[in-house]
């Protein structure tokens, strides 16, 4: 009897925490969110030069087997980036409507085409510009950089 009561209380607690959003079930977007963070978020730096791109692309494991042709690093706090997910939905390049846009500080890294993995070489361009990100989940989190 006491064991059944304990199970009931634990179930009630879990449902309450789920309702409050304190415990989140994983639907696969957690892995996509972590990948987005690894590939695109670097709030501590402003970037802007070729050396930065060469180092960060290697550190973030985007040069292991081939040189990723293009990547953007966002130099904003993750909460600022996540707030983009609360803006009006727009259409993504793939036709879905889970994209959102905002203006952020970025460094765009473009492969020079004259090197081979893992020693890839990049050209950097720092700017403040409009970006488009795809968001999923509840609460919504960025899972894909769309442009």
Swiss-Prot record:
GO cellular component, one term: extracellular space
Active site: 40, 144
Signal peptide: 1-28
GO biological process terms, semicolon-separated: antibacterial humoral response; defense response to Gram-positive bacterium
Residues that, per the record, bind dUMP: 35, 40, 68, 71-72, 145
Recorded GO MF terms: endonuclease activity; nucleic acid binding; RNA nuclease activity
Residues spanning the membrane: none
This enzyme's EC code(s): 3.1.27.-
Disulphide bond pairs: 53-109, 67-120, 85-135, 92-99
Catalytic class of the enzyme: hydrolase
Family annotation (Gene3D superfamilies): Ribonuclease A-like domain (3.10.130.10)
InterPro entries: RNaseA, RNaseA-like_dom_sf, RNaseA_AS, RNaseA_domain
Stated family: Belongs to the pancreatic ribonuclease family.
Protein name: Ribonuclease 4
Gene that encodes it: RNASE4
């Amino acid at each position: 009897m006491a064991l059944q009561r304990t199970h009931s209380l634990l179930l009630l607690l879990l449902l309450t925490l789920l309702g409050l959003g304190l415990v989140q079930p994983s639907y696969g977007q957690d892995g996509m969110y972590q990948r987005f963070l690894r590939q695109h978020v670097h709030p501590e730096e402003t970037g802007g030069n070729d050396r930065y791109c060469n180092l960060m692309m290697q550190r973030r494991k985007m040069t292991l087997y081939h040189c990723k042709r293009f990547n953007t690093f966002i130099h904003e706090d993750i909460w600022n980036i996540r707030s983009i997910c609360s803006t009006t939905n727009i259409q993504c390049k793939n036709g879905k409507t889970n994209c959102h846009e905002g203006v952020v500080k970025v460094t765009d890294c473009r492969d020079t085409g004259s090197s081979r993995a893992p020693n890839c070489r990049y050209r950097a361009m720092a700017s403040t510009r409009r970006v488009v990100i795809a968001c999923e989940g509840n609460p919504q989190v960025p899972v894909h950089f769309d442009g």
